Amino acid sequence: MWLEEIIVGFDEHWELQKYEDIAEMLGRFNGAYLAGLPLPSEPWLCRGFLQSWTHECDKYDSGIARLEETWNQSRVKGLLPDGTFERYLSFCQNRDLLLASLEKLPKVFTHNDAWRPNLFPATDRGLTMIDWSNCGLAGVGEELGRYYGLSLNSDLGDLPDKRALANEMAIRYCEGLRKAGWRGDDHLAKFGFMASAGIRCGMMIPNLLEQLSRLPEIEEIPAKWKERCTVAVHLLDLAEASIELAGGAV
């Protein structure tokens, strides 16, 4: 077995700048396959990873998030804004539209599991990634969407201005695509980013409601639940924005 020695260490704390820098590095990595580098064709590569992951999550969805009585519980009302139930149902009805639209995007080679434990940025603006077990082909922007969604879920849930970070990451990712030589439409990459990140709300919201329903009645909800709910609503915002784009010409 051949293994690469990773010289850089694991940095326990990342400034927002580092998250943004990595977004650009991922753009350079993906963009190379839009600028002439041949896509790999090995039969074992993951194809349709997001669709497969979404349908796998469905197996563990009890349907609790599609029941109005769930949303009428006092603890749920205190954590999620009015109207979120109707918005979530609309998302569920349009999810397949998003998945179909993602399939139409220009394809790139992707790591498919880019998040902090698998990323080792170097001081020379290089990036080493480990755990390539899910690598494969996906639409431009999907890599960034998964990176962003996983980052919110693991490290940045308490970030006050998530929209600003999403916008900056999208800009930096597109800059990386340009530096790699791609001259295509940035809107395609931004759609891929928003849609793939937003689809995570379809897993996160049912999971949140399932766990909240098991919590004992307490006077104050722990801060971590409030943070996770703000993340879920933000991802729903991204999903809705991408659904609007998918309804027209993506």
Describe the predicted segments one by one.
Residues Y33-E42, L177-H187:
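Surface-exposed helix-capping loop/turn segments at secondary-structure junctions
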Residues C92-E142:
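Active-site acidic catalytic loop and adjacent metal/ATP-binding pocket
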